[in-house]
Structures are given as C-alpha cells and as structure tokens.
A protein has these predicted regions:
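N-terminal accessory targeting/assembly segments
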Residues: 1-109, 423-438
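Short, acidic/turn-prone active-site loops that include or flank metal/cofactor-
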Residues: 105-109, 229-230, 344-346
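Flexible beta-alpha connector loops of hexameric P-loop NTPases
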Residues: 18-23, 52-57, 115-120, 159-160, ...
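Short alpha-helix plus adjacent loop in nuclease-associated cores
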Residues: 106-125
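Conserved C-terminal guanine-recognition region of P-loop GTPase G domains, centered on the G4
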Residues: 26-36, 41, 64-73, 83-99, ...
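Switch I (effector-binding) loop of TRAFAC-class P-loop GTPase G-domains
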Residues: 3, 184-186, 192-199, 217-249, ...
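Conserved beta-strand segments of the P-loop GTPase G domain that flank and frequently precede/overlap
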Residues: 14-18, 45-48, 80-82, 283-286, ...
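C-terminal-of-GTPase-core extension/linker across diverse P-loop GTPases
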Residues: 1-14, 32, 135-209, 215-216, ...
Length: 438
C-alpha cells in the first residue's frame, strides 16, 4: 500500500464543523469511532459552525489559530478533519500547521487498508487509495520506481513528479486489469450457482450493525466480528441449508457508512456485485442506534448506486437485547415477512429469521407449464441456459411442452431481455403477485 496511515497511538487533533447550508451533517460520535478504528489517539475535538468552507484552508483564520494552539498543547503529530478536503486545502493546512493533515475520505481509506485480508480486498483498497492520491501527488514518490525497476524509466526532460505521476497511472491501470479478472471469475461463479438453482442471500447494512455476528450465528463460520467500524471488509461466502428451500449461499459484505467515498464504491464494485445480484438482501440494522433511520437511508443510497435498490429485501432489526425487546416477525399487507427482530449476539429470534428466510426464498420460486411454438426458440434456449427445464416433450404440431422451475426474478429478467411480457406466460395468481420490493 502506498498510503501514509496514522501510526498506532499517534496523537491527533480532530476537527468537526457544522455547516448551516448542509441538510445532512456528519456525526461527531461516529467520527471519534473512525479515528480510534484507524489506530490514532484523539487528543481533543475542535468544533465550530460556518455557512460554508473556506476555499483556502476549509476553516477560518480564528479556527486555524485554535488548531495551532491545540497541536502545540497536545504535541499532536496529526490533524484529522471529519470532512472531505480538496487537495489544495489539504496542502495549505499542512503548510500552516506544519504536520500531516488527513480528511474523512483518507481516514476511511486507511481503515479499509488495515481491514483488507484477501488479495482481492487489498487490490481494491490500493486502487481506491491510488486514485485518491493521484490528485494529491505534490512530491516525489520514489518508492513507485521500485515497482517498475527504477533507473532508465524517466522520459526525456521529466521531473521526478512527472515520473511518479506516470508510474502511478501505470499502477492504477494494472490493478484495473487484475480486478477485471476478479469480476469475471465472480460472475462465472454466480452463473454456476444460478444454473445449479442455488439462491444467494447477501447481508448488507451500516457498519457495526452486527452483520458478521449474525453471519456467524447462521453459519457457525468463524468470521471476524468486533465492536468496531469496518470489522469485515472482504466478502465471505458460506453454504447453508434453509428449510423448504435447500442449499443457499450466504454472503457477508462490507459495511456501509455515511458519505462512503465514491472511489471506494467503484473500487469495491466486484465485491458489492455479490449484493447486486443476490436473490434476497438481508438488511441488518442496529435497532438500538438512535440514528438508525439515517443509517438505513445511507445503505439504501449505496444499494441504489450499485443497482441493488429494488432487490427483494428482508430487514433484520438486530441488538434487541439493548432495547429489552422481544423477537418477532413483522409482515406486510399480504402476509409476507418484512422485518425480523433478533439479537445475533444472544441468539434470540434466529429461528424466526430462519422461518422468514424460508418464506422469502420459497416464495421466489415459480413452477410453470409452457407450450412454446417453434418460432419461440430464443425463449426455449434461455430457459435451458438457466437450467430451469425439468421436463421437455414435443406435440404433433411441433410445440415444445416444458415443465419449468426457476427463481421468479430470473424469469422476469429473461422476459425483459427478450422483450416479452412475463404476464403472458404466468398464471393469474402469479400475475397478481407483485415483485418483492424493499
């Protein structure tokens, strides 16, 4: 990794500003958790209020002087802002304060770098870091030369900075190629599971909502779970048995956070695609968090960004032990499970969650008897490609008589791809049954 991270125990002065024009403000408490997760030691938190950021140093001259004094009093080596800084603001602040300055994006990137355990996760974090740093490259990064052999690589008349920028671009391009291979392999794996009719369930949620604890409780897997932000970064897949459904692939994905940097969403697209193509999303929510509604909005915003906003979703209100609340299932107007209240830590309500998962996934499977004319060969081929055909025979007129079983979502996607109306093939009872909504 090519990123200057806070050293363990490094003393930091923190800055949090409320802007009057902002509808959605950062959370100072969450900011402190982020700083501690990165390994820095918060010395003091300076707060303030402004109409808008100062274009040169983000804060005004008075707050800048406060920062100088706080840095001197606490002998801080680092200043961390709970906001996104422009490259020029970051440079100007470093000149004024004579120390390193990190913004919220850099802080989150650092935590991701520490949490990445697999080769894929490390590549994705490195890509996000390099793209973030490409706009902040103002001094020689001679260690990049070692990636390419060093001497003899500089073009005629190139400065060290120009050389480093070129090497940085080359490294970014190389990582993109490697991640393209990862995406391709993941896509092949998902297609194989689809052909084998194995539904997939992805756990999503705000960071520290308890996804990994719930994942462990459902699978008896040993996924790292801790009371800290971004304890899980790399996706973990496990096969579990769900009553009335059979084998199901359960995926634990990276936690989301307020104002998750766009570059991270892009870099982790291969990982997040597990959620985007799931048969069912399980949105894990910290029921005891006073900001839970805001957190739900943030998660749904990221899901929309990766094209997963409209997938079938079951909400799980976790940590009910902190509310002294009882496990239960809440259902929608048509009797389908909508919300399950559980405590993954104490194992309460897990049998209700298993029941809800069974209902949700069994509800998604459809059985059809189809008679297809010879000119409907594309539809017949598509159903065979999905491994959905259980029996096929032909009548005297040459029609293909198919017995079909497949996830309803796969059938609707096939119909959309072929430009056909799904209702023309579905029984009336299935036509009236709407596609699951989040």
């Amino acid at each position: 990794m090519f990123f200057e991270r806070p050293d363990a125990g490094e003393t930091a002065v923190l800055v949090h500003v409320d802007f009057q024009d902002e509808q959605e403000r950062e959370d100072a408490g969450e900011f402190l958790e982020l700083v501690r997760s990165a390994g820095a030691e918060p010395a003091t938190l300076l707060t303030g209020s402004r109409k808008r950021p100062d274009s040169r140093t983000f804060v005004g001259s008075g707050k800048l002087e406060e920062l100088r004094e706080a840095k001197a009093v606490h002998q801080a080596e680092l200043v961390i802002f709970n906001h996104a800084l422009s490259p020029s603001q970051e440079r100007n602040l470093e000149r004024e304060l004579k120390c390193r300055v990190i913004d919220r994006t850099g802080l989150i990137l650092d935590i991701f770098a520490q949490r990445a355990r697999t080769h894929e996760g490390k590549l994705q974090v490195e890509l996000a870091q390099l793209e973030y740093m490409s706009t902040r490259l103002v001094r020689g990064w001679t260690h990049l030369e070692r990636q390419k052999g060093g001497i003899g690589l500089r073009g005629p008349g190139e400065t060290q900075l120009e050389t480093d920028r070129r090497l940085l671009r080359a490294r970014i391009k190389a990582i993109h190629k490697r991640l393209d291979k990862v995406r391709s392999q993941r896509s092949q794996n998902r297609r194989a599971r689809s052909r084998a009719e194995i539904p997939s369930v992805s756990l999503v949620g705000y960071t520290n909502a308890g996804k990994s604890t719930l994942f462990n409780a459902l699978t008896t897997a040993e996924v790292y779970a801790a009371d800290q932000l971004f304890a899980t970064l790399d996706p973990t897949l496990r096969r579990v048995e769900i009553e009335d459904v059979g084998p199901v692939v359960l995926a634990d994905t990276v936690g989301f956070i307020r104002h998750l940097p766009h570059k991270l969403v892009e870099a982790f697209r291969a990982t997040l695609q597990e959620a985007a193509e799931a048969s069912l999303l399980v949105h894990v929510i910290d029921a005891a968090d006073p900001d839970r509604e805001l957190n739900v909005d943030q998660v749904e915003g990221v899901l929309e960004e990766i094209g997963a906003r409209d997938l079938p979703t079951l909400k799980v209100m976790n940590k009910i032990d902190l509310l002294d609340s009882a496990p239960r299932i809440e259902r929608d107007g048509e009797g389908r499970p909508e919300v399950v209240w559980v405590s993954a830590q104490q194992g309460k309500g897990l049998e209700l969650l298993a029941q809800a998962l069974s209902e949700c996934l069994a509800d998604d499977i459809i059985d059809l008897e189809l008679a297809l004319a010879p000119e409907q060969g594309k539809l017949r081929a598509g159903l065979h490609e999905l491994n959905a055909v259980r029996e096929e025979r032909f009548d005297e007129a040459g029609h293909s008589l198919l017995t079909v079983r497949l996830p309803r979502r796969d059938f609707l996607q096939l119909m959309a791809r072929l430009g056909e109306r799904a209702d023309d093939y579905l029984p009336t009872t299935l036509q009236e049954k709407p596609v699951w909504e989040a």
